[in-house]
Amino acid sequence: MFLISGISSILAIGLLSPVQSIVCLIVLFVSAAISLYSNGFVLMGILYVLIYVGAIAILFLFILSLLNIEYNYKGTIHPLIFTILIICLIPLDLSYETYGIVENVNIAYPFNSLLDWDLELTTVGSLLYTEYAIPMILIGLILILSVIGAIAITK
């Protein structure tokens, strides 16, 4: 996943089209979520997908659809080459991460991680709704105001 994250971060910075850059950012966030999920941070991986890919990427695409950005592609390399390159490098990246780790695989780990995931989710939920209730309400109000502001800009 490190190779995919590196390539997608370079492409997110280097591509001229903002929509293509957002797609590369989505790939970057999904690969980070997969890395977190595979390392045992189940809740953080799920939250990366929900928050970054779900909310921020949709908000960016909504803002980019409001802007009329015209760009002229002057490069000699076609974007299809980057896509083919990434597709060809995915098996190398996955085999690089699993090479040498297969001997230490614990078969009971997935079952234990499901039990830990429930405990982790319960802990985070109880903390968010008891100790951090006021900041959660403020974050909700900020999100509502940003949605209302985005709707007001479009009209």
UniProtKB/Swiss-Prot annotation:
Belongs to the complex I subunit 6 family. The chain crosses the membrane at residues 10-30, 43-63, 75-95, 133-153. InterPro entries: NADH_UbQ/plastoQ_OxRdtase_su6, Nuo/plastoQ_OxRdtase_6_NuoJ. It is found in: Mitochondrion membrane. Pfam families: Oxidored_q3 (PF00499). One of its GO terms (molecular function) is NADH dehydrogenase (ubiquinone) activity. Its EC number is 7.1.1.2. Its main location: mitochondrion. This is NADH-ubiquinone oxidoreductase chain 6. It catalyses: a ubiquinone + NADH + 5 H(+)(in) = a ubiquinol + NAD(+) + 4 H(+)(out). It comes from Candida parapsilosis. It is a multi-pass membrane protein. Core subunit of the mitochondrial membrane respiratory chain NADH dehydrogenase (Complex I) that is believed to belong to the minimal assembly required for catalysis. Complex I functions in the transfer of electrons from NADH to the respiratory chain. The immediate electron acceptor for the enzyme is believed to be ubiquinone. One of its GO terms (cellular component) is mitochondrial membrane. It is an enzyme of class 7 (translocase). Keywords: Electron transport, Membrane, Mitochondrion, NAD, Respiratory chain, Translocase, Transmembrane, Transmembrane helix, Transport, Ubiquinone. PANTHER family: NADH-UBIQUINONE OXIDOREDUCTASE CHAIN 6 (PTHR33269:SF17).
